[in-house]
A protein has these predicted regions:
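DNA-contacting surface of Y-family translesion DNA polymerases
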Residues: 8, 181, 189-331, 340-364
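Short Gly/Ser/Thr- and Asp/Glu-enriched loop/turn motifs at secondary-structure junctions
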Residues: 101-105, 144-147, 280-284, 329-333
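Gly/Gly-Pro- and Ser/Thr-rich, intrinsically disordered tail segments characteristic of DNA damage-repair
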Residues: 1-215, 221, 338, 342-346, ...
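Residues at or immediately flanking beta-strands
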Residues: 138-140, 286, 333-335
Length: 365
C-alpha cells in the first residue's frame, strides 16, 4: 500500500486563530476559546496560551491558574463551521476523497487528483498557500503513504508545518518517535510501556506480536503495525459519526467515592471539550466502567434535550454512577460517551480504547 498519496491537513489552533484573525487586538496574546466560569472548559488555546501549559479540554480554573493573564473568548461555532466549509472548498479543488476528522482536520487521498499534480507535497504546498491567502489562517500538512504516518508528519513541525515521510524513510522516522507520540498511547499506556523498557518506536518494533497482545490486548496488534509504518485504513469520503466519548484508564484501581467522583469529573470535562470541538449533538449519555477483574458494564440515560454542557452532563454521570457497586468491585477504567439514540442500534466499537475514529486527535491542536 506504499503507492498511496495521503495528506493530513490540520489547522493550527483553529478556533483561537479565527478569533485572533477577526479581532486584531487579540493577536499575540494568550487566549482560550471557552467560558471562564467555575465549570467552564477550554475548547481551544492559542499558541501563546500553550506556552503556559494551557490545553484543550482543560478546566477553565486550571487554565487560569497556569496563565493568569489568559483571555477567554466565547466560542462562535457557526463562524468556525463557515470557515471550515471554505477550507473544504479548497480541498475539493484537488480531490473529492476527503475524510473530515473535525472542523479543522482532514485526510485527503490525492493518489489521483483533479489537476493531475504528480507530487503530493506540491498539492500540500498549494493548499497551505491558498488557506493563508484566502482565509488568513495557517495550516500544517503531513504527507505519506498511509494515514498514521501522514498524521504523525503533520504534527512534526507545527505550527505552519510541512513534512513528508517517504516509504524509504518510514522505519527510521518511526524508530525515533517517543512512545508518547504514537496515537492511542496515553499517559497510563506510556507508563506501562516504560516499565516494559519501551520508550520509542525502535524499542516498540523489537517486541513480538505475542508480547504486545498479551500486555495490551487486541490494540497490541495496532502498536505492532504502527511500529512498522503499517496502516491499511483507507481515506473514507463519507464518515458518519455516531458518538463522541473518552476513556480514562486509572493508574491504580479505586473504590473510594471521593476518588471516583474526581475521576468522573475529569472525564466529563474532557467529554465536554470533545463535544464542542467536534460540534456534536446527542441526547444519550453512557457511562462505562471497567473493574479490576476486567469485567465491565455500561449504563445509559436519554434526555429530551441535547447534552453539551458540563453542568448537565456531570449530574447525569453521577446519577448513572449510583447504579455501580464499585465499593466491592474497584474501578480501573471510567468512560463517558454522548450519542444519538436513533443511531445507537449497534454500540460495537464505540467503547474500544482504540476505535480508529481518531478520537484522541479531535481536540484542537
Amino acid at each position: 500500500m506504499t503507492g498511496r498519496k495521503i495528506i493530513h491537513i490540520d489547522m493550527d489552533a483553529f478556533y483561537a486563530s479565527v478569533e485572533q484573525r477577526d479581532n486584531p487586538a487579540l493577536r499575540g496574546k494568550p487566549i482560550a476559546v471557552g467560558h471562564a466560569e467555575e465549570r467552564g472548559v477550554v475548547a481551544a488555546a492559542s499558541y501563546e496560551a500553550r506556552r503556559f501549559g494551557v490545553r484543550s479540554a482543560m478546566s477553565s480554573l486550571k487554565a487560569k491558574r497556569l496563565c493568569p493573564q489568559l483571555i477567554f473568548i466565547p466560542g462562535r461555532m457557526e463562524v468556525y463551521k463557515s470557515v471550515s466549509r471554505q477550507i473544504h472548498e479548497i480541498f475539493h479543488e484537488y480531490t473529492d476523497v476527503i475524510e473530515p476528522i473535525s472542523l479543522d482536520e482532514a485526510f485527503l487521498d490525492v493518489t489521483e487528483n483533479k489537476p493531475g499534480i504528480p507530487l503530493a507535497v506540491d498539492i500540500a504546498k498549494e493548499i497551505k498557500r491558498k488557506v493563508r491567502e484566502r482565509l488568513n489562517l495557517v495550516a500544517s500538512a503531513g504527507i505519506s503513504y498511509n494515514k498514521f504516518l501522514a498524521k504523525i508528519a503533520s504534527d512534526y513541525r507545527k505550527p505552519d508545518g510541512l513534512c513528508t515521510i517517504h516509504p524509504a524513510q518510514a522505519l527510521d522516522f518511526v524508530a525515533r518517535l517517543p512512545i508518547e507520540s504514537f496515537w492511542g498511547v496515553g499517559p497510563v499506556t506510556a507508563k506501562k510501556m516504560h516499565t516494559l523498557g519501551i520508550h520509542n518506536g525502535e524499542q516498540l518494533r523489537m517486541q513480538s506480536l505475542e508480547m504486545l497482545t498479551r500486555e495490551f490486548g487486541k490494540v497490541g496488534t495496532v502498536y505492532y503495525d504502527f511500529a512498522r509504518g503499517i496502516d491499511i485504513r483507507p481515506v473514507e469520503a463519507v464518515r458518519i459519526r455516531k458518538s463522541v466519548g473518552c476513556e480514562h484508564t486509572l493508574e491504580k484501581d479505586i473504590s473510594k467515592r471521593s476518588s471516583v467522583i474526581i475521576e468522573l469529573y475529569h472525564a466529563a470535562v474532557e467529554l465536554v471539550g470533545r463535544l464542542e470541538h467536534a460540534n456534536f449533538r446527542g441526547n444519550t449519555l453512557t457511562l462505562k466502567i471497567k473493574f479490576h477483574d476486567f469485567s465491565q458494564i455500561t449504563r445509559s440515560v436519554t434526555q429530551s434535550k441535547e447534552l453539551t454542557a458540563l453542568d448537565v452532563i456531570l449530574p447525569l454521570a453521577k446519577q448513572l454512577l449510583r447504579e455501580v457497586d464499585y465499593e466491592h468491585h474497584p474501578i480501573r477504567l471510567i468512560g463517558l460517551s454522548v450519542s444519538n439514540p436513533r443511531e445507537e442500534s449497534d454500540e460495537k466499537g464505540v467503547w474500544e480504547q482504540l476505535s480508529f475514529e481518531f478520537s484522541d486527535w479531535e481536540l484542537d491542536e
